[in-house]
Amino acid sequence: MEVYNYMEYIVQDALEDSLKNKNDICKCQKCRSDMQACALNKLPAKYVVSEKGRVFTKLQEVEIQFRADVLREVTKAIAQVSKNPTH
């Protein structure tokens, strides 16, 4: 198994859920990638190399503070990129 940052998957899922309700902003792949990168730069990395590590990190997702932190940074990233798209 390769080393990967599981936070990328968490942020991607949160971003997709958040964008479902947004109809007044650009949702092109460039903007989505910028939003994801912006949020990831503000959140701690969650590197995993095993199934056990992935499961442990997945369990952290149910913690209210963890979810709130991810949602806060995703919301900020959406606002920031929407105001200043790079295309």
Task: Enumerate the language-model features and the residues they cover.
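Charged, amphipathic alpha-helical regulatory modules used
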Residues: 1-87
